[in-house]
């Protein structure tokens, strides 16, 4: 395992390629959890992610003979771009194997950094196997996305930057996927300040670290289901698990709904965009069992496409009670839409969408279903709409988040 001086040497090594992402104080997230919250915005890092730190550190430490052989990696996202840029800066050939259906924007970004891209397989595991075949055939050096001491060492430089800027930080919240970033940050932070608390945050639908800790060894998850695709890892690494067991104080999980809510707050209040995996620590703030502490949330990346941004904002509005969707059964006769409009106006609700469906009910000749989506300003406003309809003799059915968000 790495020592403090190893992380300090890595920090010097990375000065030629990375930027120091300055901490941002967050009033809104502080209010949400009752702590003094700072954001470490690695979404503003070169390539849009922390991954370049570990990739560059690994490749820069190769021997001249290894550099001459070239490097290879398998990735559908941030690791690909980190390896590609690091290799380009160091004048080394890089080959990246990506699943065939990787979004074109990520493929092109990786190519622009100078790497040769090989598209293979439907999922990451198939791309990984292809990368292993090419490594054996061509003698490339494989750069693992997380289960590698040199990669972990590079990611740990984030902790040194945080503690240089905020030496009295009490808690660090770090995303967990394969475990590389939490391993590096936890080790470097604890070696620098043994009293600091490090908490890993992983998706409920991809809790590979918790599963490994319970079994005391890495185990594959039966299913991975999360919107945090960058941390949707079926099995954590062996090396990273040892770091987690030694240095990480706690692992917590967050739901997709909590990610949606955190995304909206980050965009709305800080004018920052981050990928779903990157906001895991922000979503985990409400689950802290402490108050009044200085907490740093590591926002690890910002590579997210425009359509996903739009979807996350809309879903965040639903979760925060800013959009309310409900259904109401109406007599199938003229004038009912007017009555509904009057009740919505009385409740100061601005209509976004109406769906008047005569065929939803079996007895369509007697009543029809109207589904309504309105803008609201929170739960109190939603309740006032419900009460307004009730006093006028209408019973409305509130659609729950899963019904709305699955559409």
Stretches with model-predicted labels:
Residues 1-407:
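PLP-dependent amino-acid enzyme catalytic core
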């Amino acid at each position: 395992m790495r020592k403090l001086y190893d992380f300090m040497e890595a920090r010097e090594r990375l000065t030629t390629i990375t930027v120091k992402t300055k901490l941002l104080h967050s009033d809104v997230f502080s209010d949400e959890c009752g702590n003094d919250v700072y954001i470490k915005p690695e979404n503003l890092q070169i390539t849009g992610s922390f991954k370049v730190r570990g990739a560059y550190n690994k490749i820069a430490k190769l021997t001249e003979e290894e550099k001459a052989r070239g490097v290879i990696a398998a990735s559908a996202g941030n690791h690909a771009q980190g390896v590609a840029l690091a290799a380009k800066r160091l004048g080394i050939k890089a080959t990246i194997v990506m699943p065939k259906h990787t979004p074109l924007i990520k493929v092109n970004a990786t190519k622009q950094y100078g790497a040769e891209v090989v598209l293979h397989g439907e999922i990451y595991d198939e791309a990984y196997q292809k990368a292993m075949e090419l490594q054996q055939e061509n003698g490339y050096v494989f750069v693992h996305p997380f289960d590698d001491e040199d990669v972990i060492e590079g990611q740990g430089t984030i902790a040194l930057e945080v503690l240089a800027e905020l030496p009295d930080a009490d808690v660090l919240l770090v995303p967990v996927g394969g475990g590389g970033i939490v391993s590096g940050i936890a080790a470097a932070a604890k070696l620098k300040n043994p009293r600091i608390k490090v908490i890993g945050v992983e998706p409920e639908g991809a809790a590979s670290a918790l599963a490994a800790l319970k079994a005391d060894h890495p185990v594959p998850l039966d299913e991975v289901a999360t919107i945090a695709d960058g941390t949707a890892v079926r099995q954590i690494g062996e090396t990273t698990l040892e770091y987690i067991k030694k240095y990480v104080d706690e692992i917590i999980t967050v739901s997709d709904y909590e990610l949606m809510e955190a995304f909206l707050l980050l965009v709305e209040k800080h004018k920052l965009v981050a990928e779903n995996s990157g906001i895991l620590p922000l979503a985990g703030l409400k689950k802290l069992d402490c108050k009044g502490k200085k907490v740093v949330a590591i926002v690890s990346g910002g590579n997210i496409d425009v359509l996903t941004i739009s979807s996350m904002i809309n879903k965040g509005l639903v979760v925060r009670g800013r959009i309310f969707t409900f259904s109401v059964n109406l007599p199938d006769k003229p004038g009912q839409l007017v009555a509904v409009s009057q009740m919505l106006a009385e409740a100061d609700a601005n209509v976004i969408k109406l769906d008047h469906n005569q065929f939803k009910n079996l007895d369509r000749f007697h009543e029809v279903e109207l589904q309504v989506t309105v803008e609201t300003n929170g739960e109190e406003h939603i309740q006032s709409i419900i009460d307004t309809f009730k006093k006028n003799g209408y019973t409305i059915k509130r659609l729950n988040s899963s019904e709305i968000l699955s559409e």
